[in-house]
Amino acid sequence: MKKIKHWWIGAGVALATAGASQIAAAQSNVSLYGVVDVYVAAQKALGKERAWNVSPGGMATSFWGIGGREDLGNGYAAVFALEAFFQPNNGGTGRFAGDTFFGRNAYVGLSTPAGAFLLGRNTTPYYVSALRFNPFSTSFAFSPVLNHMYKGVSGQGLAGDNGWNNSLLYTTPGGSDWQASLIYGTGNKAGAQGQNQWGGNAIYAHGPFSATVAYQQVRYDKTPGDLNAQIAGFSLQSAVMAAVGYDFSVVKITALYQYLHDGIDSGDLNTHSGQIGASVPIGNGALLASWMYAKSHGRGDPIRSTWSVGYDYRLSKRTDLYAAYMQDRATGYSSGNTAGVGMRMAF
């Protein structure tokens, strides 16, 4: 049991930072990698009608990537990664219509004894912390954490994407209990508020205990070109997260807290949210459960509550089958729910 326990969480984080594995490689190389994930589901989104779908990304968003490393000697190496999302259910590119082609990561950089420095489009440290401390990891279909953060309603979600354009990412060297990252994104034009877009995280893991803190701040123009703003007059968002996890062998427990502050001309919005999750090894897989609750102050004080249960069965080192159910309720919307089964394969 110990051999397979919680493998999907580690796999999810590894897939989220797949290009970064090139940084730690010992020799010069170029590799092709990715994941294909499709599921069948009965889906009823908040406030909408039910539909039967064959959809991409039940447990992980499908993508392919090319990553490379050139050893420069003395502990230095040049690295790159180009990673594109796709939709295996219909052969489409991106996560959605209009998504940028290399939307996952697209960077070049240096790996040094002092850490890695990457320039381009980079996955945010905030997102990496969120994956590490929720049992559904990379699942945008079934993870309450990712649904609240990146599919927010009534203004409760994070602003922008989980990857930042025009950014510099620094990550400390591996090999210790601590890992930290800092990211800064520019607006790429004089006077752009987006030039002040920054964040970071720190993750500690030793034995069965792990913890993280993460922060990010985004600034946008009142009518931004790179943010689909649902709230007029939005200009700033600050987000902070703290989470802990403990692996008792028979069950791994995670707890997460998030605070969001939105600066809005018509009145600020402040949101407190928390998640409790568990993963229990059963057979050649695991039972997953997670619940997240969010309450805002301002703009009608909306509330959202979401819970999910699922079972992830490991067929091999690279392939798994899963079944999951999510229930979603939010102020001002009819309830939503999703039930689905799917298959995921990494390469």
PLM regions: where:
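Outer membrane beta-barrel
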Residues: 27-43, 51-186, 194-196, 203-210
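Repeated loop/turn-to-beta-strand initiation elements of outer-membrane beta-barrel proteins
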Residues: 76-78, 114-117, 177-180, 208-213, ...
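Solvent-exposed loop/turn segments connecting transmembrane beta-strands
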Residues: 158-165, 186-196, 264-270, 297-304, ...
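Detector for outer-membrane/organellar transmembrane beta-barrel domains
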Residues: 198-308
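Outer-membrane beta-barrel "beta-signal"
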Residues: 335-347
